[in-house]
Amino acid sequence: NYTKVPLVIHETFFYTSDTLKNGGREMFGFLKKKNEVVENNTMYAVANGTVIPISEVNDPVFSQKMMGDGYAVVPENGEIYAPIEGEVLSVFQTKHAIGLKMTNGLEILLHMGIDTVELNGAPFTIKVKAGDQVTADTVVAIADLEAIKAAGKGTEMVVIITNMDKVAQFSLEKTGVVTAGTPVGSATAN
């Protein structure tokens, strides 16, 4: 009991010399979109623990937003996850920080602990490298929280947007006890 209805699809192509040089691939949007990345503005909890506003971090460089806006997680255990969907830009030689880039172009610094640069990487096992693609369920590092505490350092995992000039809006929407990978905020690029 189907009715046959004619379907007419009409497409107009405008050829340019660039289109012809590239074998006409630009004519077909579906070929081009295969490599496009969908923007994701969501920021996630990097560990099981307690999310706090960056203003509550016990270090003025972070709490006064000198490096940018963001949030922190006081972790319950040492499994540290990516705070965003995107790409790893760099891993600091001292292993205490990882630079990332969101799919929307915003740059994020995951700073593991307070003053942990002085520990020369000892309490951190890094699980990613520059160029890796990450999601909220990607473990980026294992932090030995007991070693960090024994050295007299804070264990807060601080997530900072470092290129604030490119931010249209940042909002921290969830604080308190969370599990790793829980959406806690968003950052949109301008």
Where are these regions (language model features)?
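Short, Lys/Arg-enriched N-terminal segments with co-localized hydrophobic residues
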Residues: 1-26
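Contiguous, well-folded functional domains in the mature portion of proteins
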Residues: 24-190
